[in-house]
């Protein structure tokens, strides 16, 4: 501890003149009373009584405001020698006065902060981002409420410095600190928040509609349109011209510039303000804003707006579905415009687009550099142009052929397991004689395309117990519902499975297809080719109608077994190239109903009944066909007669999607009769499901294989549900939610742990 007895006594005599002048300037004195610095300096032990009395009065007046700081100061300040007691009183008074001034500055600063918090939302409040040249809106506030702070002189600083050595650290800082500058408070928002929040506001503005750029503010009074507008983060709003890129900071300037890009005869101006536009609905929305008319209201909150585009954009704020996701990163957004900006900025690729209910929709694509708002549908996709959402997709199921449904008479129905699952799709029976040639049934490229193009296929030569393509089911039975427990969109599933099956053809199947395609032209009659070619050329395709079926083919016919031959023909490609291939681009799925003639032992009605099998039949143009007379089975001179020999071929169903009529028949066995195998494989087909011999269950050979997971299914519904989880672009990516999995095990674990509705 410091020994004050050995410390040299501080000499205050040389500073008495400064103390006297300080008190003379700040303390009121009696008239005619003056302090002589020289006389005080000559007799330092005799303190002037008038100055001491005034000082005591001043201290008593301020004692109630400064009692605690003075007690602390007196407790921490050591007592100097008794000879300098008079000078110490002058020093204490000066220090107290500086502390009082410091306290006043702090009070004014706190009052200014409170005033700023109450009025920060007003346009006249403080704005740290005020552009240069514009007046500071807080100048009037500080000028009227704050007093200028006196600056300390060099003499006072030099005087306080040696004394502050003996005081505590807090008092030393207060003594050496100049009076505080009353500066405006900084913006409460951080730089990162100020960058993120305006970006979100910009997303909502740019994604809603073109109509919203005039609807951003609630009022268009003279102040708002002629003065810059600042958001809550202090950022000034600007208006950028989409034609030339000029940026304006006020609405009046922006409208004046926009007028230069408009044709004079198309300018529409608001009668109440300088607003101009070329579109009538924009002017209508603007006038509604003047009248405070907001007819569109959100059904989930109190939000109201002047047009439906703004309401649609607002409704996305209530949804938890992020429809647009990036395939290369974790970015997800609800707005298509923001998604395009992300893809352009980072060069990423878009992921699977979701509908408003969260269902994946592979038919929607993102035109990254296009000007069209929202996603667009693929060419020939199941979504009609201009539709983006679950409503558009579901409407395609309803857009089918009512004439097809009305033309079908009431008839006995025999359903299998799959047909029962598909809402009991009826079997079509036929009993009339058809032409002898075997036709080809091309499956539409996508479920959205009408199967009216199938009407160019010739009649089938045998009775039908055929598994129809899923696309035909959806087109001809518009009231068919989805799987109630999986909520599978069969229409989307059909389009995906068509593309998936094409990639899993075995080499053996490709060779068979090439051999069978070479015999296609020899097995068709010229008159049927001419007739159906005329129908395909002269008649227009109605996408909303199904394939018309002749009334004479819709009569009640005895049900007979028929082999379902699924064939995938890839035309105009090196994989499936053949000399007789058609000029259609891409890959086409084909179904061929090759003649499976019944043996004499199978002629009884009991043997004609189809056992329980996961193969349904449908009222497709190839389903209800006339039976082949038995006398045709005796001839062997022509290719048509050789196909009609009473031989039963038995084959196993390959890994083909039943719901989508996928033709993956890599496991198909060869025909039991070698003589009829080459002639019976006309029109480029492979036997996938054949009628079993007498006494053999039909379901014994029905096996469905998933080559991705190396799993076999005996039930078509289970196989269809399983294949619905494989995505077309990545087989181990969940088709329901878009999550990528590691192999088949990861996909099964994902299916078991996550609910897909």
Swiss-Prot record:
Keyword Oxidoreductase: no
InterPro entries from the UniProt entry: Znf_C2H2_sf, Znf_C2H2_type
Regions of compositional bias (Low complexity) in chain numbering: 397-414, 512-521, 651-694
Places the protein is found: Nucleus
Biased composition (Polar residues): 39-51
Gene Ontology CC terms, in alphabetical order: nucleus
Region (Disordered): 30-51, 171-213, 367-416, 511-535, 602-694
Pfam families membership: zf-C2H2 (PF00096)
Keyword Zinc part of the UniProt annotation: yes
Biased composition, class Basic and acidic residues, residue ranges: 197-213
PROSITE patterns referenced in this protein's UniProt entry, alphabetically: ZINC_FINGER_C2H2_1 (PS00028), ZINC_FINGER_C2H2_2 (PS50157)
Domain of life: Eukaryota
Start-end of C2H2-type zinc fingers: 239-261, 268-290, 296-318, 324-348, 704-726, 732-756
Keywords from the named record: Developmental protein, DNA-binding, Gap protein, Metal-binding, Nucleus, Repeat, Zinc, Zinc-finger
GO MF, one example: zinc ion binding
Acidic residues composition bias: residue spans: 522-531
Cited SUPFAM superfamilies: beta-beta-alpha zinc fingers
Any one GO BP annotation for this protein: anterior/posterior axis specification
Homology family: Belongs to the hunchback C2H2-type zinc-finger protein family.
Record's function text: Gap class segmentation protein that controls development of head structures.
Record's protein name: Protein hunchback
Species annotation: Drosophila sechellia
Upper lineage: Eukaryota, Metazoa, Ecdysozoa, Arthropoda, Hexapoda
């Amino acid at each position: 501890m410091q020994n004050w007895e050995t410390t040299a006594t501080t000499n205050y005599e040389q500073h008495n003149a400064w103390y006297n002048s300080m008190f003379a300037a700040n303390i009121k004195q009696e008239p005619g009373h003056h302090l002589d610095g020289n006389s005080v300096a000559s007799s330092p032990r005799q303190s002037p009584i008038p100055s001491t009395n005034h000082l005591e009065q001043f201290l008593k007046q301020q004692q109630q405001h400064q009692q605690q700081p003075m007690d602390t100061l007196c407790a921490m300040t050591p007592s100097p020698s008794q000879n300098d007691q008079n000078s110490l009183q002058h020093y204490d008074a000066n220090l107290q006065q500086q502390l009082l001034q410091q306290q006043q500055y702090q009070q004014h600063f706190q009052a200014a902060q409170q005033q700023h918090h109450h009025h920060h939302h007003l346009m006249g409040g403080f704005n740290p981002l005020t552009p240069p040249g514009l007046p500071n809106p807080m100048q009037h506030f500080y000028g009227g409420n704050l007093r200028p702070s006196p600056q300390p002189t060099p003499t006072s600083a030099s005087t306080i410095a040696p004394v502050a050595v003996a005081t505590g650290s807090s008092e030393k800082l207060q003594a050496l600190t100049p009076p505080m500058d009353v500066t405006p408070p900084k913006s409460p928002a951080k730089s990162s928040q100020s960058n993120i929040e305006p970006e979100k506001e910009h997303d909502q503005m740019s994604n809603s509609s073109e109509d919203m750029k005039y609807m951003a503010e609630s009022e268009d009074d003279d102040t708002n349109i002629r003065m810059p507008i600042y958001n809550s983060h202090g950022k000034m709003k600007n208006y950028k011209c989409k034609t030339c890129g000029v940026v304006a900071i006020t609405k009046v300037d922006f409208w004046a510039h926009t007028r230069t890009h408009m044709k004079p005869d198309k300018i529409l101006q608001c009668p109440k303000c300088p607003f101009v536009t070329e579109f009538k609905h924009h002017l209508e929305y603007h006038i509604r804003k003047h009248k405070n008319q907001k007819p569109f209201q959100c059904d989930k909150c109190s939000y109201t707006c002047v047009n439906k585009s703004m309401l649609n954009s607002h409704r996305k704020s209530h949804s938890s579905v992020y429809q647009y996701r990036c395939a290369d990163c974790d970015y997800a957004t609800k707005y298509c415009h923001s998604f395009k900006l992300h893809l352009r900025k980072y060069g990423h690729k878009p992921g699977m687009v979701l509908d408003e209910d969260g269902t994946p929709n592979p038919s929607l694509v993102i035109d990254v550099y296009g000007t069209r708002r929202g996603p667009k549908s693929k060419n020939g996709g199941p979504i009609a142009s201009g539709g983006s959402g679950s409503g558009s997709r579901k409407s395609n199921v309803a857009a089918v052929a009512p004439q097809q449904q009305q033309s079908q008479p009431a008839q006995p129905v025999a359903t299998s397991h799959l047909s029962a699952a598909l809402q009991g799709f009826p079997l079509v029976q036929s009993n009339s004689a058809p032409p002898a040639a075997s036709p080809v049934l091309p499956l539409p490229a996508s479920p959205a395309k009408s199967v009216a193009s199938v009407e160019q296929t010739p009649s089938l030569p045998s009775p039908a117990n055929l598994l129809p393509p899923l696309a035909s089911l959806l087109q001809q039975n518009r009231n068919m519902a989805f799987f109630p427990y999986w909520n599978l969109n069969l229409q989307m599933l059909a389009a995906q499975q068509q593309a998936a099956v094409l990639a899993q053809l075995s080499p053996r199947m490709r060779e068979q297809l090439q051999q069978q395609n070479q015999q296609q032209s020899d097995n068709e009659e010229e008159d049927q080719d001419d007739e159906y070619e005329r129908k395909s050329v002269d008649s227009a395709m109605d996408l909303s109608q199904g394939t018309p079926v002749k009334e004479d083919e819709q009569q009640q016919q005895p049900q007979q077994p028929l082999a379902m031959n699924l064939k995938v023909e890839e035309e105009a490609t090196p994989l499936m190239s053949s000399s007789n291939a058609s000029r259609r681009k891409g890959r086409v799925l084909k179904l061929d109903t090759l003649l499976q003639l019944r043996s004499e032992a199978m002629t009884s009605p009991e043997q004609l009944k189809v056992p329980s099998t996961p193969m349904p039949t449908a009222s497709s143009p190839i389903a209800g066909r006339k039976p082949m007379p038995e006398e045709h089975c005796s001839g062997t001179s022509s290719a048509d007669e050789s196909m009609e020999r009473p031989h039963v071929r038995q084959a196993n169903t390959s890994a083909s999607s039943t719901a989508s009529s996928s033709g993956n028949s890599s496991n198909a066995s060869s025909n039991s009769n070698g003589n009829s195998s080459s002639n019976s494989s006309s029109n480029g087909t492979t036997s996938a499901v054949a009628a079993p011999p007498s006494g053999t269950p039909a379901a014994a050979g029905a096996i469905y294989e998933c080559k991705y997971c190396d799993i076999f299914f005996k039930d078509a519904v289970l196989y269809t549900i399983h294949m619905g989880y494989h995505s077309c672009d990545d087989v181990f990516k969940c088709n329901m939610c878009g999550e990528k999995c590691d192999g088949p095990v990861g996909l099964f674990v994902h299916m078991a742990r996550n609910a897909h509705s």
